[in-house]
Amino acid sequence: MRPWLRHLVLQALRNSRAFCGSHGKPAPLPVPQKIVATWEAISLGRQLVPEYFNFAHDVLDVWSRLEEAGHRPPNPAFWWVNGTGAEIKWSFEELGKQSRKAANVLGGACGLQPGDRMMLVLPRLPEWWLVSVACMRTGTVMIPGVTQLTEKDLKYRLQASRAKSIITSDSLAPRVDAISAECPSLQTKLLVSDSSRPGWLNFRELLREASTEHNCMRTKSRDPLAIYFTSGTTGAPKMVEHSQSSYGLGFVASGRRWVALTESDIFWNTTDTGWVKAAWTLFSAWPNGSCIFVHELPRVDAKVILNTLSKFPITTLCCVPTIFRLLVQEDLTRYQFQSLRHCLTGGEALNPDVREKWKHQTGVELYEGYGQSETVVICANPKGMKIKSGSMGKASPPYDVQIVDDEGNVLPPGEEGNVAVRIRPTRPFCFFNCYLDNPEKTAASEQGDFYITGDRARMDKDGYFWFMGRNDDVINSSSYRIGPVEVESALAEHPAVLESAVVSSPDPIRGEVVKAFIVLTPAYSSHDPEALTRELQEHVKRVTAPYKYPRKVAFVSELPKTVSGKIQRSKLRSQEWGK
């Protein structure tokens, strides 16, 4: 254990008798809070980041010791349900035991070495959290991905990241097999299944036989932890690399302040495992000793979510605004949420009327936050702070967030500009390391003393930020970031498409959706528009991830262009949004 942490834990275990009641049972102690306060001080930038840090060793194993000493309520650390009666509960001790076994699978049968990269493409199964922790224990860099990735998406990610291993489920294994021969770095394929598949190692079988003894890798704080692919407006998705500390410690403050978590809380975030919000949940909840609740939730179903909130003692809920829009359309008076005390949302703009309807029908406020794959939480409405409906909240420590013009000059309150985070003279440790293998994109994201988020907003005189839109053309539909070039490239593969432009279009449920303006080739100009629309939509679903398909299609004779011939998506977007 690191020297800076050993002192705190030994103090906790040494002093446990002093806090025992007359029956010798541990009473509520301040000691775990002292440990959390140390992590929080680092997260807030008030204490230096240690040279060495490993989340599994320095956080999870510490909570396991505190749990064993009786310094934590009897909540599980992890609680998974599938909606048909199956449940899995792990204490921190059991999580440690199972993750050490998983670490032996990665380092043994998979042959992974510290620094090697592994893709995790799994639905909401317990193995995702188990393997994530195992990656930390072995120094393996994890690369999460959504289960909707197509063969083309998987090939690009495996080739670009040079991942040596992938773990996935039965439904995606055929897609991986179809492209694995074109991915020379890929050495092992790990299957989470109760059945076998030729050419694949069965994770569950290997886990059953693995040893519980494992020495955690001694990682440096700046060593890579995770890579996330994020969509952009030009070309292929970028690789965002985060370090052991940027995620491992960077989310502690938001977990304590915005999510308001304690060791008594049970936290359910409905996010997909492939998105950064899954990592945010892990790194927010477990440092605070909280329980992560997971429902397998094969598809979003408002009634399933509401019934789950009624059945289980969930105290804290986080959903994207799209889901809250669906929930408030139900008759919420039919449900009783006896344990629910705190609700959060982020990933896209929240309509004020949704927040008001939710609060009116449940009595629970909705607290909005804002961040990116490149950062941790940038702005938020912490619990207890006055909420201004429609605002993203105030800057979250340790960030100095400003609104700047296109030259990087700070703008006064009330003026719209670029959302920027100060990175000089000191770069916040919770920032991403870089866009991997892309120094040009990394440099382009900075301007003077600031990192430019690519989003536009204004800040009022009280320091609240109000989202105005994106500088780029990325479409944010139900919190899925979709690059227009990816959709346009998919459309271009169909013989009916001469050229296309893809922009966002307003939608009452999803906030915004993909709309494609298409100029047809002469051979298809007389085709039935409705039938052709359906054909093109199905084509995009086959070529790229299904969530990227254009829900709206307009056939036009020409597209607006600049003098140099570049398509002006901004004009089409303004037309859609009435600006």
Curated annotation (Swiss-Prot):
Any Gene Ontology biological process: fatty acid biosynthetic process
Organ and tissue specificity: Detected in kidney and liver.
Keywords in alphabetical order: Acetylation, ATP-binding, Fatty acid metabolism, GTP-binding, Ligase, Lipid metabolism, Magnesium, Metal-binding, Mitochondrion, Nucleotide-binding, Transit peptide
Catalytic activity: a medium-chain fatty acid + ATP + CoA = a medium-chain fatty acyl-CoA + AMP + diphosphate
Cofactor entry: Mg(2+); Mn(2+)
Binding site for ATP: 230-238, 368-373, 455, 470, 566
Organelle transit peptide: 1-26
Function: Catalyzes the activation of fatty acids by CoA to produce an acyl-CoA, the first step in fatty acid metabolism.
Family label: Belongs to the ATP-dependent AMP-binding enzyme family.
Entry protein name: Acyl-coenzyme A synthetase ACSM5, mitochondrial
Protein's organism: Homo sapiens (Human)
Classification lineage: Eukaryota, Metazoa, Chordata, Craniata, Vertebrata
Gene that encodes it: ACSM5
